[in-house]
Swiss-Prot record:
This is 2-hydroxy-6-oxo-6-(2'-aminophenyl)hexa-2,4-dienoic acid hydrolase. The active site is at S114, D233, H261. Its EC number is 3.7.1.13. GO terms for molecular function: 2-hydroxy-6-oxo-6-(2'-aminophenyl)hexa-2,4-dienoate hydrolase activity; hydrolase activity, acting on acid carbon-carbon bonds, in ketonic substances. Coiled coil: none annotated. It comes from the Bacteria. It catalyses: (2E,4E)-6-(2-aminophenyl)-2-hydroxy-6-oxohexa-2,4-dienoate + H2O = (2E)-2-hydroxypenta-2,4-dienoate + anthranilate + H(+). Pathway: Xenobiotic degradation; carbazole degradation.
Amino acid sequence: MLNKAEQISEKSESAYVERFVNAGGVETRYLEAGKGQPVILIHGGGAGAESEGNWRNVIPILARHYRVIAMDMLGFGKTAKPDIEYTQDRRIRHLHDFIKAMNFDGKVSIVGNSMGGATGLGVSVLHSELVNALVLMGSAGLVVEIHEDLRPIINYDFTREGMVHLVKALTNDGFKIDDAMINSRYTYATDEATRKAYVATMQWIREQGGLFYDPEFIRKVPVPTLVVHGKDDKVVPVETAYKFLDLIDDSWGYIIPHCGHWAMIEHPEDFANATLSFLSRRADITRAAA
C-alpha cells in the first residue's frame, strides 16, 4: 500500500504517483509516471503554480514513452519554502540538486515553461553533464519589458479575483477558464509559506528588471533544444522564441496558434506530441552516432 507521500492520482488516463525527495536539504515534491529515459517537467512562476495543475494533461501522453517526472519548484506547490533569497541562482541549484538526488541512470531531458524554462536552461549550461535535451516553452531568460500583461503576475494581490486576472493574462483570449483551476491555484497561492516565498520571488524579479540572462550565456546552451511558443503569448511575446532560436545553435522552433503562455494547458496534446517528436528524433540521432 502506498503511504501518504506516494498517493496515486486517477485524474488522468495514466496514473501518476506523488513522491518527495530531499534535494540539497529542500524537501521536494514530484509526480512520476511511465518508464524509460527520464524527462523532467518544470512549471512556471505564476502564483499558485505547481506540477499537477500545470502538467496533468501532458504527463499521460509523455509517459507512454518516457519516465516522466514533474517537480514543484523551490517555493511552489508542496515543495519546501525555506527562509532564503529566492534568486535564479537558487532555483538552478535546486534543480541541479533534485536531479542528483533522483540518482537517474544517465542524462535527463528537461521541459520547462516560463521560469521553469529559464531554470532548465541554466542547468543545461552550468551542468551540461546532466542534460541530454532541452524544451523551452514560453520561456523566460531574455529581456522582456515589464508590461501591463505582466503586472497581474508580478503584482498578484492574493485575491480570487486577482487569480482570475492572472490566468487571463497567461492564456489566449478564447481559453475557457474553469472554477476548478482558479480554486486550486488560489488555494496554493494563499498558503502562508507559499505566499511569503512568492512575494520574495517577485521582489527579486522586480529588482533585477526581469528574469533574464546575458545573451552570451544563452549561446552556451550545449544540448539540442526545442523552442515552443504560443503565437498569442501576452506575457512573453512570440518574438522571444526567434531570439532563442538565433542564440542557440542546435535548436528547432514550434509555434502554436491560438495559444498564450501555457501551451501545456491550452493545447496539451499538440504540445506533448511536438515534444515527443523532438525527443524521439534526438534519440534516433544519438543511437546512430553511438
